[in-house]
Amino acid sequence: MPDNTIRSNSDVVLIGAGIMSATLGVILKELQPDIKIEIYERLDVAAAESSDAWNNAGTGHSAFCELNYTPEKADGSVDPKKAISIAEAFEVSRQFWSYLVQQNKVPSPENFIKSVPHMSFVWGEKNVKYLQTRFEALQKNPLFSEMLFSTDFEQLKQWMPLVMEGREPDEKLAATTMAIGTDVNFGALTRSMFNYLEKLDGVSLYFNHEVRKLKQLENKSWRIKITDLGSGEKRKAYTKFVFIGAGGGSLPLLEKANVPEGDGYGGFPVSGQWLKCTNPEVIAKHQAKVYGKASVGAPPMSVPHIDTRVIDGEKALLFGPFAGFSTRFLKNGSYLDLPLSIKANNLIPMLSAGYNNIPLTKYLIEQVRQSPKDRIKALREYLPTARSKDWVLEKAGQRVQVIKKGENGGGVLEFGTEVINTQDGTLAVLLGASPGASTAVSIMVDLIGRCFKEQINTPEWEAKLKNMIPSYKQTLNDKPELLEQIRKQTAEVLKLNRN
């Protein structure tokens, strides 16, 4: 029988057409214009899973308002470290996106980024005290110097009129606001980046193509077996470097790669739902991302928010996310994803993480059992005047939280984003969930540093990275003048007004 397998050779293969692969592809092509890149995506369009606007839990994560990034310590103080690192990373993303706009590599910034204030909102004496402590810990840092805090009823009404409707002046309430917050449509941004990439010499983008097998050859290069889901045609792609950026699909692919660095990793899938507002009058009354505090015992990804989004030019309002449990790793995945991901090398970490996270299990069971009435009740904590007829339930994306081997051999459930790379730098994979997309540029620059060690230190690559990201190799949280200059410049290019 004739072998009809199509064979190809490249320098880089990107698996998954989401924000991470788009970012890595564009940066590598800028650094080395003659680099040959192949991109494989199992769906028929880019950014249809985790990067899509309706699937993305928190767009524009910059740690201005997400309280899970500033945990309260036992002594009542607040640790600002994680919030500072995320805010720093978001500034890097803003610089890179500005570069893309200035160079006409992506169309007008209005397509993917808008000014939307970021607010934190709490009630009850203990939470008000926490928010004030958080404000004091963050506001002295240049990244957060524009943050405002208030407990004044009239002031809060000005900041978030819809949230304050139906409340009494004697309620114990507090909020912070950051006027420079943004809403980012990562689906639109990702598709624009792939549209640009696809037109370049040496870039091939394949939709409806599923990666079935990965094998490292003796010469350290990789052979990837791929099936065209439309025609059934088989392909073999040979490449020097593989990046797996397939969202929830990354873990099964890491397992197929059979590298020692992947041992002990597991994944815990969490599905999501939103309440979406259908009343244009209500949508028009709210212009902010208002984040609350997760209830006691709930995991950090459960932080509720009432969120203004601009999706495909239309203003939208959503509340959530409500979590659920599904054994799928992707919205378009299989119910066998979780059971098939359990292997001998990750069984103990998986069981141990389950045993050590009883509150998470309890929380998910409660969420799954919620009735429409329960969801509206949760919404009314944020919008007391909400009417159930103005809201519908929408399915959001799948998140796969990382489980990794702890020091004692047991499992630790991680709530962040994790990059794993092989020692020889020929394969890298991104696992995990938030902050994800917002910090994609920092994550990919770090990945390039790990996997292209020789090239990244050449004067040529360094100069190009500095051109794309003016603050490259510098921190902004301790350089107020540089931060102000960069924020001003990126706000201008990205058309972020302060209305």
Locate each region found by the language model:
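Helical element adjacent to the flavin cofactor pocket in flavoenzyme catalytic cores
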Residues: 173-241, 438-452
